[in-house]
Regions:
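Alpha-helical transmembrane segments and their membrane-interface boundaries
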Residues: 1-72, 76-78, 97-141
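Hydrophobic alpha-helical membrane segments
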Residues: 84-97
Length: 141
């Protein structure tokens, strides 16, 4: 039940960012579904015991494939969908902990949090670049 509530919250978060980016109609729903896919993939894998970086990578691959397919089916830019889905996975808590540790002069913890956050962000970037490159090189028509 807890995962279901988180997935619904991810849907509305992605949908809200779609509103912020002036998306309209069915694109808002597509963005919300993509955010739900991203968060469900991440949390499901995390609960299965997969490492956090791999969870971020696989969740990014899942929503990036979804966004690329929706972009081709509904003739909409994949970038706008991807950005709305990407917001869900941004490691904000790690960034907060890094800055908090710096401000409290706990530099060893700051480096630990910073490296962890940077590796999570890198996993997200690699997943998105990987799928985008594959879809640009492979012609589905």
């Amino acid at each position: 039940m807890h995962l279901f509530i988180e997935v619904i919250a991810a849907f509305f978060t992605a949908l809200s960012f779609g509103v912020l980016f002036n998306m309209k109609g069915k694109n808002l729903i597509l963005a919300g579904i993509g955010g739900s896919i991203a968060w469900f993939s991440y949390k499901f894998l995390l609960n299965m015991g997969v490492t956090e970086n791999l969870c971020f990578f696989i969740a990014t691959v899942c929503f990036a494939i979804y966004c690329e397919l929706c972009a081709r089916i509904y003739m909409t830019p994949a970038t706008t969908l991807s950005v709305c889905c990407l917001i869900i996975l941004v490691p904000g808590y790690g960034i907060y902990n890094t800055m908090y540790s710096v401000l409290t002069n706990n530099y060893i913890k700051a480096v630990e949090y910073g490296v962890s956050t940077l590796s999570c962000a890198s996993s997200i970037a690699l997943g998105l670049v990987f799928i985008t490159t594959v879809f640009r090189k492979v012609n589905l028509y």
